[in-house]
UniProtKB/Swiss-Prot annotation:
Family: Belongs to the universal ribosomal protein uL15 family.
Pfam family, one: Ribosomal_L27A
Record-given protein name: Large ribosomal subunit protein uL15
Sample GO molecular function, one term: structural constituent of ribosome
Function: Binds to the 23S rRNA.
Native organism: Allorhizobium ampelinum (strain ATCC BAA-846 / DSM 112012 / S4)
Domain of life of the source: Bacteria
InterPro entries attached to this UniProt entry: Ribosomal_uL15, Ribosomal_uL15/eL18, Ribosomal_uL15/eL18_sf, Ribosomal_uL15_bac-type, Ribosomal_uL15_CS
Bias type Gly residues, positions: 21-35
Region ranges (Disordered): 1-39
């Protein structure tokens, strides 16, 4: 078999039907749209209209809300911090905070603070100051001989 010998399976694709090209074509004049009415015009389909049936957006109940005061943290894993230390982007002897992580390119956007997650391994002794951390992250940092100070999100924002 050669690339130039490959063919589609029989019946796997149909030719496009050109509508409105003369009565003799079988799809001329009205082009398979019937006669007049909304569906014969262009720009049909009323969004969300289901033919008179109660539409799904009205059948389902309204639920929940978006809390405008909720804090949104930028998450960073221990594995990424360790990678940055190994690459020489982060100084392990200095305190690692949100500004240091941003400067090193570990995080892109600083939202309401940084939250450290326990994904990956940490082998270097570090001092971290962030808005929050998960329990596994705290355990891994302390196991590596480091310390972590968790600030409030408001305190980190003001820095």
């Amino acid at each position: 078999m050669k690339l130039n010998e490959i063919k589609d399976n029989e019946g796997s694709s149909k030719d496009r039907i050109r509508v409105g090209r003369g009565i003799g074509s079988g799809k001329g004049k009205t082009g398979g749209r019937g006669v007049k009415g909304q569906k014969a015009r262009s720009g049909v389909a009323v969004n969300g209209f289901e033919g008179g049936q109660m539409p799904i957006y009205r059948r389902l109940p309204k639920r929940g809300f978006n809390n405008i005061f909720a804090s949104e943290f930028t998450t960073v894993s221990l594995g990424r911090i360790q990678t940055a230390i190994d690459a020489g982007k982060l100084d392990a002897s200095a305190t690692i905070d949100a500004a240091a992580l941003k400067a090193a390119g570990v995080i892109r956007r600083l939202k309401d603070g940084v939250r450290v997650l326990g994904d990956g391994e940490l082998t270097t002794k570090v001092t971290i100051e962030v808005a929050g951390a998960s329990k596994p992250a705290v355990e891994k940092i302390e196991k590596a001989g480091g310390t972590i100070k968790q600030l409030s999100a408001a305190a980190e924002k003001s820095e």
